[in-house]
Amino acid sequence: MQQRMTFWYLLGYSLSKAIARTFFDYRVIGAENIIEEGPAIIAPNHASFLDPPLAGTACKRAIHYLARKSLLDWPVMGPLMPEWNVIPVDPKNAERSALMGIIRVIRAGGAALIFPEGTRTKDGRLQPAQPGIGMIVAKTGAPVVPMRIFGSFEAFPRDRKTPRRVPITVVVGPPLRFDAAEAAGRDAYQKISDRVMDAVAGLKV
């Protein structure tokens, strides 16, 4: 798994940051909390299609992402998805294909972006956490960096075809670490996920 920024990744990263700063007055608060080396999970809220690049450009390291397998069929951008560390999700076997891919990345010392809520909000409010991120934490022992993106829902909610020019701020909280006892057993998955989501909810501008 690619842990460093390749030419194409760095190009996408640089363009995303330039666009975010130009059109959304993009800023990051708490960037010093991001784990820049070794296994890590970046855990932002999910309000918009813009969230993956907004979260990724807050980091100074290569991040791995989940995306629908169909996105790889997009003209121009599709072939670049693997260069941007996109792990395709097969809708017919989403849980296994996605989660196992992410676990391999993290165990190899990489960083992955996981949305605790699992899907985009419909109304801009935070949603309950799903157990997926808790399972990944339990399987890998990786620390979790809570992150909250303010403004992405107002800029590009589900029902819009084009984004609005709205200020966007990313707030990063201190990493969360879970010991072996906290990660033991299936009932731990949801508890870990809930703790991560509580940390995300507690972040303020």
Residue ranges and their predicted role:
Residues 25, 39, 167-169:
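A residue-level signal for beta-strand positions that form part of recognition/binding surfaces
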Residues 2-11, 97-205:
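Non-catalytic C-terminal accessory region of glycerolipid acyltransferases
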Residues 28, 65, 86-88, 144, ...:
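Conserved beta-strand scaffold positions in the cores of enzyme catalytic domains, especially
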Residues 32-35, 162-163:
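A short beta-turn/loop motif at secondary-structure boundaries
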Residues 31, 45, 68, 92, ...:
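Generic beta-structure capping elements
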